[in-house]
């Protein structure tokens, strides 16, 4: 049984297990799920990503956790924390992010998972502030950010996205420990 970090009324956020690999590969290869990312991920890239997630959780006690529905024990995506690997006026920082499979969109799972993760970040991990960002075109993800109570900080050009790409401009949000 993988280590559970967070439980919500409908979800379990936990360490990754081998049975997550195939659905994660499908998730990362879904063009609609990956619409606001520069490219879909290959099988090898997805497996490498899982390996990094597992190592981060083991070594730091946090990272991107696998998200599982309680009602059917189905892997539906991930949510959790990372340290963006690019230079910007707000980095270094802790970022919260998520990605869920399309059949699980529109049911409040992303907000439930992200909200509980934010609480875990402040109460258990003692983070002082947590950022989130997404493409200005990703209105669904931005709505999740807003629903978790994060405060808009402005816009920035994502340095890892090619200049001229419609995905380059991002909206930035932040939540600080005192405004939870």
Task: Label each PLM-derived region with a short phrase.
Residues 56-60:
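Short loop/turn motifs at secondary-structure junctions and domain boundaries
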Residues 32-53, 63:
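Conserved GNAT-fold acetyl-CoA-binding loop/helix
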Residues 61-63, 80:
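Glycine-centered flexibility motif
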């Amino acid at each position: 049984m993988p280590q559970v970090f967070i439980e919500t009324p409908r979800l379990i956020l936990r360490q990754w297990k081998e049975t997550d690999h195939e659905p994660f590969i499908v998730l990362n290869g879904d063009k609609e799920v990956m619409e606001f990312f520069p490219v879909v991920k290959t099988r090898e890239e997805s497996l490498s990503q899982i390996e990094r997630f597992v190592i981060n959780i083991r070594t730091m006690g946090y990272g991107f956790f696998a998200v599982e529905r309680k009602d059917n024990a189905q892997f539906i995506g991930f949510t959790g924390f990372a340290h963006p690997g690019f230079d910007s006026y707000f980095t270094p920082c802790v970022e919260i992010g998520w990605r869920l499979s399309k059949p699980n969109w529109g049911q409040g799972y992303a907000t439930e998972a992200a909200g509980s993760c934010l609480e875990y970040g402040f109460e258990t991990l003692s983070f002082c502030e947590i950022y989130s960002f997404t493409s200005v075109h990703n209105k669904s993800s931005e709505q999740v950010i807003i629903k978790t109570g994060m405060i808009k900080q402005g816009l920035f050009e994502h340095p890892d996205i090619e200049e001229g790409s419609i995905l380059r401009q991002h909206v930035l949000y932040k939540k600080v420990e005192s405004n939870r």
